[in-house]
Design a protein with these regions (language model features):
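Alpha-helical transmembrane segments of helical membrane proteins, especially in multi-pass transport
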Residues: 154-158, 175-206
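Juxtamembrane inter-helical linkers in multi-pass membrane proteins
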Residues: 96-98, 161-177
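Juxtamembrane boundary at the C-terminal end of a transmembrane helix
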Residues: 245-258
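Interfacial loop-to-transmembrane junctions
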Residues: 220-244
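Alpha-helical transmembrane segments
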Residues: 138-152
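Structural signature of hydrophobic alpha-helical transmembrane segments
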Residues: 141, 200-216
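Soluble N-terminal domains of membrane-associated systems
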Residues: 1-93
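Transmembrane alpha-helical segments and their cytosolic interface motifs
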Residues: 99-132
Length: 258
């Protein structure tokens, strides 16, 4: 970018990111997350466009349809600010930020849904269930804290990379191999779900905790191995639940050897 070109100050960038945490607060059927996105980017537009008419025009172009995974949208927000700086410097046409958003929202929504919604969150939900059964509410607080720390760190990284790299953010996110990582997390999550089923059944039948813990570990290991060898996810999950309940019932009937 040329010398003396307008830049968004760090404070405004921080406000933009903070506002992005409320991206879905004004969700609507017509524009989906458009109002939340416009609200998030407004501090950057205020820093770039001193003229109210120009600022109003810039804000209006961000009121069009927008829908993405709320965590992955941080990368688009950062990249859009990157392009708005170029528009303010006269290096790009006003439509460039809109085209950037339209191009990335679909692919990043798919990546975000696959990693966060169908892999990371279910895994931590299962861990919270198992941890709460074994150790009580402190385990629930711990798992929630870790999950939120992970997604906040990733969101900050997405936002910074989008702002600094612009279009190159696509390559950076691709190198993270989130789809492959999501598959491994799903395998682990299925195993933990089987362990949770074993613990619930064991608790109901007053099986000693040591026996329940070993049964849960066995179910988790068997479920993970089955999935790693190509077994369908839903079959492995049902089998893990069945084995877990069966172990709990056998232990209840014949006593725990542990």
């Amino acid at each position: 970018m040329k010398e003396g070109a307008p830049r968004v100050p760090p404070g405004a960038l921080a406000r933009c990111f903070g506002r992005s945490l409320f991206l879905q607060a004004a969700w609507n059927r017509r524009g989906m997350q458009n109002l939340g996105f416009a609200y998030a980017i407004f501090p950057a537009l205020s820093a770039l466009y001193a003229d109210k008419a120009v600022r109003r025009e810039a804000l209006a172009r961000h009121l069009g349809f927008f829908n993405c995974h709320p965590y992955a949208a941080a990368a688009i927000l950062g990249g859009t600010i990157h392009h708005e700086e170029k528009v303010a410097a006269g290096l790009e046409p006003p439509g460039a930020p809109v085209a950037y958003k339209a191009t990335l929202q679909g692919p990043l929504a798919a990546i975000g849904d696959g990693f966060f919604w169908t892999a990371l969150r279910p895994l931590f939900g299962a861990l919270a269930a198992v941890g709460t059964l074994l150790f009580g509410w402190p385990a629930l607080v711990l798992t929630l804290t870790i999950y939120n720390a992970i997604h906040l760190v990733l969101r900050i990284g997405f936002f910074r990379t989008g702002y600094r790299r612009g279009d190159d953010v696509v390559g950076v996110i691709a190198r993270l191999s989130l789809p492959a990582m999501a598959e491994r997390l799903r395998l682990a999550g299925a195993g933990v779900c089987g362990a949770a089923a074993a613990l619930v059944a064991a608790r109901a039948d007053q099986v000693p905790r040591s026996g329940a813990l070993y049964a849960a570990a066995l179910v988790a290991a068997l479920g993970y191995c089955a999935l790693a060898r190509g077994a369908p996810l839903f079959l492995a999950a049902y089998a893990a639940v069945a084995v877990g309940v069966g172990l709990a019932l056998l232990t209840h009937l014949f006593g725990s050897p542990l």
